[in-house]
């Protein structure tokens, strides 16, 4: 079985990585859900600010005794908006941690593969077994997942960094723009991969054993 050792090392790295992907995917999804009401709050504040700007307070008799009311109202609304932006920044930091954690674990898998690539039989790398996709497929899927999180994070970071109170229309459109990022992505990528590797994760050593049996059958 010594000739199987390099394959076993790579498979073990894969088995450690996919559960991390699943855990981080759950954190990613819950964080995105946390962002939705915050984005709606910002959108509503922008709508209120726009309504207040279009109202001529001096034309309302009941408001004339309060000449600074419009400015005080605007300040309060902007302060409330800044509180929401701070909360969104915290959620964005969590998304960055997810992206970095997945990237780090994917890199570890590829380091394990590259360290043993010279002695790995290419047919073994390309061949699936009864319980496992091929190592080549699983490596490709991890690359896809890593790119997915990297791209999604950058799009969301760019969207939030573009917020400024001088463009109230864009702030009102934030919830739709945020959701559009998800709609443009393959929303089942990670879950589909996790289903595909589920038996592999449940059968430690199963792939090497199966491959060995195929050699000797």
From Swiss-Prot:
<dbReference type="Pfam" id="PF15011">
    <property type="entry name" value="CA109-like"/>
</dbReference>
<keyword id="KW-0539">Nucleus</keyword>
<dbReference type="GO" id="GO:0005634">
    <property type="term" value="C:nucleus"/>
</dbReference>
<comment type="function">
    <text>Part of the 55LCC heterohexameric ATPase complex which is chromatin-associated and promotes replisome proteostasis to maintain replication fork progression and genome stability. Required for replication fork progression, sister chromatid cohesion, and chromosome stability. The ATPase activity is specifically enhanced by replication fork DNA and is coupled to cysteine protease-dependent cleavage of replisome substrates in response to replication fork damage.</text>
</comment>
<protein>
    <recommendedName>
        <fullName>AFG2-interacting ribosome maturation factor</fullName>
    </recommendedName>
</protein>
<dbReference type="InterPro" id="IPR029159">
    <property type="entry name" value="CA109-like"/>
</dbReference>
<dbReference type="GO" id="GO:0005730">
    <property type="term" value="C:nucleolus"/>
</dbReference>
<keyword id="KW-0963">Cytoplasm</keyword>
<dbReference type="GO" id="GO:0005737">
    <property type="term" value="C:cytoplasm"/>
</dbReference>
<dbReference type="GO" id="GO:0005829">
    <property type="term" value="C:cytosol"/>
</dbReference>
<keyword id="KW-0690">Ribosome biogenesis</keyword>
<dbReference type="GO" id="GO:0005654">
    <property type="term" value="C:nucleoplasm"/>
</dbReference>
<keyword id="KW-0597">Phosphoprotein</keyword>
<comment type="subunit">
    <text>Part of the 55LCC heterohexameric ATPase complex composed at least of AIRIM, AFG2A, AFG2B and CINP. Does not associate with pre-60S ribosomal particles.</text>
</comment>
<dbReference type="GO" id="GO:0042273">
    <property type="term" value="P:ribosomal large subunit biogenesis"/>
</dbReference>
């Amino acid at each position: 079985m010594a000739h199987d050792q390099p394959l076993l090392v790579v498979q073990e790295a894969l088995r450690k990585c996919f559960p991390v992907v699943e855990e981080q995917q759950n954190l990613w999804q819950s964080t995105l859900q946390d962002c939705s009401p915050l984005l709606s709050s910002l959108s509503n504040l922008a709508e209120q600010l726009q309504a207040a700007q279009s109202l001529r307070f001096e034309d309302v008799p009941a408001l004339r005794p309060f000449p600074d009311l419009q400015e005080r109202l605007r300040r309060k609304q902007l302060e409330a908006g800044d509180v929401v932006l701070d909360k969104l920044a915290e959620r964005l930091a969590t998304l960055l941690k997810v992206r970095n954690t997945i990237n780090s674990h994917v890199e570890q898998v590829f380091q394990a593969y590259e360290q043993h690539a010279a002695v790995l039989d290419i047919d073994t790398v390309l061949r699936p077994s009864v319980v496992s996709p091929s190592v080549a497929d699983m490596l490709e899927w991890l690359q896809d997942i890593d790119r997915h999180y990297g791209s999604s994070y950058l799009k969301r970071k760019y969207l939030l960094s573009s917020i400024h109170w001088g463009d109230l229309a864009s702030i009102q459109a934030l919830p739709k723009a945020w959701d559009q990022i998800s709609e443009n992505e393959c929303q089942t990528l990670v879950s589909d991969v996790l289903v595909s590797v589920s038996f592999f994760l449940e059968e430690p050593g199963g792939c090497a054993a199966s491959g060995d049996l195929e050699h000797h059958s």
